[in-house]
């Protein structure tokens, strides 16, 4: 059985890890980095770039470079968070036929799971290159506060990438696993994981207990905001720069997508620099131009200014901490360790706020970028049966229920219930002789169903005529270990049953996922062809260079006819390399043609080199002979006449 890899599919960066024995290995990607930007670029020639190469070209291709797609995964187009992003993103966010938020690149509609699958495929390939064997199974992390649709969409992304998702695990829980197994402290401890990533915020209160030599990780509560993260901090800096530039130059950069992409890069860089220095300078020459000529942007930002810009964002993370502590039934003073996860927690202001709330210094011995992937890899090892000393008890982050008479949300499973879990309840009809009931499933904490997230709905038909309140309909909610909900309804009188996995009114159908898998496979074949074409071009370029060099050195030793033949073959190879529409076969044919034409040139070079070597060997032999003679002479010269006297024996 192959290894189960752990993948942290992040909003800004992603990371992959595996377990080797009891040691964890965070794997470097093909660029040599341990984290990969979650950025995907769709190029004009159908090539798909993922990670650092996609990020590098984002300034020149803003409309087709997709980033922070995790913020859209499993979301409806109408949601206010999505509507907010539409005005900020350089790429187009569109409404899919099923009402979900999708994006558009090169006129093609793409589902967020399909785009995230490109990042997962890169992570899969990174692991395969390191292990030297195929990888088919993974544990993928999601924010703890992700709802059912978002978890299902993440699982779909894994499927499209060719991975069997063995488990969806919450990011703070994964970080706690990484932290707990790395520390030697014994005894029960309560820890708070404060996870502020690129696009999402989570806080979990977790109890780590030692039960008969087994490490038990029990999540007591979780809370968060799935639309708050480093991207929002970047946006505050971007808005500030746009405002200052408009005041100074009278030009509004928010309408210029190329300028926006440069601003985004500069804002991220400035934010990172201000974590270690008090002031930074943003310098972007030729940011735009008007009738008076080009405009340059030069702006100093201090740490104090940045903190003022994002103060309310940092403050927004504290209320979920308060709720999580209350829901866990503990006091702030009961928390033994505070762990910071996510790149945004490197900001001194964030660390200061966390220290102020929890009353203690956060731990600094956890890598905020890698802890989540490490935890996912540990869970992968547990699921594969290679590790028996770890037990993980996670919770469902939001209450689940159904809409009952008057539009009320009747909760079936309350938030922070340990999963997997199952709950059944009997309901009845609202009208006399009602032959069918529609069951609408919601997720959220509001009293009225309309204020919560509608996950799906289904009908139970064929109920025998009876007065209202008489039929008995048993509704069962079953949450699996991934936090994904399965619902069933049964008429107790007739035994009629209807079951669904909640993904009815949104998300991708199996047919759509299968089509995306096929497209991905076709893309892989296309990518392979592009790679082969690039290899042929490189081979052709190298041959042109070496042939020209050889002609310069040895061309005068060839017959005029032979030289002309080589020059003609060289010219036709150069022409085919200049032709961007030329395929691999055309290039290979010209390479072979030049190779054959250059045979005589090769023979001349070889003969010349042999002659040089023979000459060098002869010279060396002569020198060696001279050295021998000189040595003999020296040996003779080194003879010393010794004085001796004869000793007579008695």
UniProtKB/Swiss-Prot annotation:
Q: Which residues carry this modification: Phosphothreonine?
A: 200
Q: What induces it?
A: By stress conditions e.g. heat shock.
Matching InterPro entries: ATPase_NBD, Chaperone_DnaK, Heat_shock_70_CS, HSP70_C_sf, HSP70_peptide-bd_sf, Hsp_70_fam
**What domain of life does the UniProt record list for this protein's source?**
Bacteria
| Alphabetized UniProt keyword annotations | ATP-binding, Chaperone, Nucleotide-binding, Phosphoprotein, Stress response
What SUPFAM superfamilies does this protein's entry cite? Actin-like ATPase domain, Heat shock protein 70kD (HSP70), C-terminal subdomain, Heat shock protein 70kD (HSP70), peptide-binding domain
Alphabetically, the GO molecular function entries are: ATP binding; ATP-dependent protein folding chaperone; unfolded protein binding
Region annotation Disordered: where it falls in the sequence: 613-634
According to its UniProt entry, the function of this protein is described as: Acts as a chaperone.
Enumerate the PANTHER family for this protein: HEAT SHOCK PROTEIN 70KDA
Q: What does the similarity note say?
A: Belongs to the heat shock protein 70 family.
Alphabetized NCBIfam families for the sequence: PRK00290.1, PRK05183.1, prok_dnaK
What is this protein called in UniProt?
Answer: Chaperone protein DnaK
Q: What's the source species for this entry? A: Burkholderia vietnamiensis (strain G4 / LMG 22486) (Burkholderia cepacia (strain R1808))
Q: Which gene encodes it?
A: dnaK
């Amino acid at each position: 059985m192959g290894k189960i890899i752990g993948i942290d599919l992040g909003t800004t960066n992603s990371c992959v890890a595996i377990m080797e024995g009891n040691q964890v290995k965070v794997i470097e990607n093909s660029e040599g980095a341990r984290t990969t930007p979650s950025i995907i670029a769709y190029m004009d020639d159908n090539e798909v770039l993922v990670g650092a190469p996609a990020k590098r070209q984002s300034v020149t291709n803003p409309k087709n470079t997709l980033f922070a797609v995790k913020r859209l995964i499993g979301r409806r187009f109408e949601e206010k968070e999505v509507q907010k992003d539409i005005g900020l993103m350089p790429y187009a966010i569109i409404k899919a036929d099923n009402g979900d938020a999708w994006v558009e690149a090169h006129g093609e509609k793409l589902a967020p799971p399909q785009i995230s699958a490109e990042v997962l495929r890169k992570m899969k390939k990174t692991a395969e290159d390191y292990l030297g064997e195929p990888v088919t199974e993974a544990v993928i992390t999601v924010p703890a506060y992700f709802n059912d649709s978002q978890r299902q969409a993440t699982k779909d992304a894994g499927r499209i990438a060719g991975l069997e998702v063995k488990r969806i695990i919450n990011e703070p829980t994964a970080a706690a696993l990484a932290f707990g197994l790395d520390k030697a402290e014994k005894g029960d401890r309560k820890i708070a994981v404060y996870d502020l990533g690129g696009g999402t915020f989570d806080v979990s209160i977790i109890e780590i207990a030692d039960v008969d030599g087994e490490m038990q990780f029990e999540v007591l509560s979780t809370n968060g905001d799935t639309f708050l993260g480093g991207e929002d901090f970047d946006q505050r800096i971007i808005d500030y720069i746009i405002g200052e530039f408009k005041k100074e130059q009278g030009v509004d950069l928010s309408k210029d997508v190329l300028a926006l992409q440069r601003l985004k890069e500069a804002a991220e860089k400035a934010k990172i620099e201000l974590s270690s220095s008090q002031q930074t300078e943003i310098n972007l020459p030729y940011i735009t131009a008007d009738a008076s000529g080009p405009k340059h942007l030069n702006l100093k930002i201090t740490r104090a200014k940045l903190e003022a810009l994002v103060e309310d964002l940092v403050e927004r993370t504290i209320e979920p901490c308060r709720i999580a502590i209350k829901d866990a039934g503990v006091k702030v003073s009961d928390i033994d360790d505070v762990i910071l996860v996510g790149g945004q927690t490197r900001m001194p202001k964030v660390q200061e706020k966390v220290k102020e709330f929890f009353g203690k210094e956060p731990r600094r011995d956890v890598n905020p970028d890698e802890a989540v992937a490490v935890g996912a890899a540990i869970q992968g090892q547990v699921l594969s049966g290679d590790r028996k000393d770890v037990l993980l008890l996670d919770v469902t982050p939001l209450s689940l229920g159904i809409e009952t008479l008057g539009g009320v949300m009747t909760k079936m499973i309350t938030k922070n219930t340990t999963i997997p879990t199952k709950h059944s309840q009997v309901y009845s009809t609202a009208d006399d002789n009602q032959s069918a009931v529609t069951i609408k499933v919601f997720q959220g904490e509001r009293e009225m169903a309309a204020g919560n997230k509608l996950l799906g709905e289904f009908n139970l038909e064929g109920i025998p005529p009876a007065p209202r309140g008489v039929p008995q309909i048993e509704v069962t909610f079953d949450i699996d270990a991934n936090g994904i909900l399965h619902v069933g309804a049964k008429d107790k009188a007739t035994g009629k049953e209807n079951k669904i996995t909640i993904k009815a009114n949104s998300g991708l159908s199996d047919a759509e996922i299968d089509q995306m898998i096929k497209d991905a496979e076709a893309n892989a074949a296309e990518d392979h062809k592009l790679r082969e074409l690039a290899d042929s071009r490189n081979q052709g370029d190298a041959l042109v260079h070496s042939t020209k060099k050889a002609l310069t050195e040895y061309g005068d030793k060839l017959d005029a006819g032979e030289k002309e033949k080589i020059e003609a073959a060289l010219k036709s190879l150069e022409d085919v390399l200049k032709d961007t529409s030329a395929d691999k076969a055309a290039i290979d044919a010209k390479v072979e043609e030049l190779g054959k034409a250059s045979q005589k040139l090769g023979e001349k070079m070889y003969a010349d080199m042999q002659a040089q070597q023979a000459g060098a060997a002869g010279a060396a032999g002569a020198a060696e002979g001279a050295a021998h003679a000189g040595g003999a002479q020296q040996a003779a010269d080194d003879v010393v006449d010794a004085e001796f006297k004869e000793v007579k024996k008695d």
